[in-house]
From Swiss-Prot:
It comes from Saccharomyces cerevisiae (strain ATCC 204508 / S288c). Residues 9-155 form a coiled coil. GO terms for biological process: late endosome to vacuole transport via multivesicular body sorting pathway; protein transport; vesicle budding from membrane. Interacts with VTA1; the interaction occurs at he endosomal membrane. This is Vacuolar protein-sorting-associated protein 60. It is a peripheral membrane protein. Its main location: membrane. Residues 186-229 are annotated as: Disordered. Residues 218-229 have a biased composition (Basic and acidic residues). One of its GO terms (cellular component) is endosome membrane.
Length: 229
């Protein structure tokens, strides 16, 4: 029944704007065509009036028929000009309406884009739980503090283990032994084995004694040479 009586489905606001835009474009095009036709007719009437004027000048205004014809043409031209002025006013009104419609359509496009952006932002922010984010940050800080405490405990354990390996009695005995040793470095290679402590020489220490060559005087050397000959 609605279709029969012209009440179809309700159209959206965007569809109404598009249809009104199309109808105004068609109306403006029709007005432009009509104004162009009137301009052509007025130009033809002006050409006829020019010819009549030339004929009247030749006849010294002695032909009443030409004057009547010119008067009719002038009246017709005036009517056409009035029609053209009216159409120009209508065209200007249609142009203003078209501009208003275009602005409204652009505004609706902007509003729809803002609505879509707002909905998208709400959907994205809706997935974020600020309380959970804060809890996660607190947990991360706690884990960092626990890691720092663990490193401090490990460092303390390592240092205490090294100190606990040696007792106070052993430390005193070692210090006394070191005090009795002479750590003055020798000035020559011959005094290396005598002046350096034994525990610093190790397995590569030189022997405690060195055989020296006998001192032979000149006569003994000569006898040795004669016996050799």
């Amino acid at each position: 029944m609605n279709r029969i009586f012209g009440y179809g489905n309700k159209k959206s606001h965007d569809q109404l704007l598009q249809e009104s835009n199309q109808s105004m474009n068609q109306a403006q095009q029709s007005l432009s065509n009509r104004i162009s036709q009137l301009d052509t007719q007025i130009a033809q009437l002006n050409f006829q009036l020019q010819n009549i004027q030339k004929n009247l000048q030749r006849s010294n205004n002695k032909q009443p028929s030409l004057r009547k014809q010119a008067l009719k043409i002038l009246n017709k031209r005036k009517q056409l000009e009035n029609m053209k002025d009216s159409l120009d006013s209508q065209s200007w009104s249609m142009t203003q309406a078209q501009l208003t419609n275009d602005n409204l359509q652009n505004t609706m496009i902007t509003i729809n884009a803002l609505k879509q952006t707002n909905n998208a932002m709400k959907a994205q922010y809706g997935k974020i739980n600020i309380d959970k984010l804060q809890d996660m940050q607190d947990e991360m800080l706690d884990l960092i503090e626990q890691g720092d405490e663990l490193q401090e405990v490990l460092a303390m354990n390592n240092n205490s283990g090294e100190l606990d390996d040696i007792s106070d009695a052993e430390l005193d005995a070692e210090l006394d032994a070191l005090a009795q040793e002479d750590f003055t470095l020798p000035t020559s290679e011959n005094s290396l084995g005598n002046d350096m402590p034994s525990y610093l020489l190790g397995a590569n220490a030189p022997p405690a004694f060195i055989d020296e060559e006998p001192n032979l005087d000149t006569e003994d050397k000569n006898k040795a040479l004669e016996s050799a000959q």
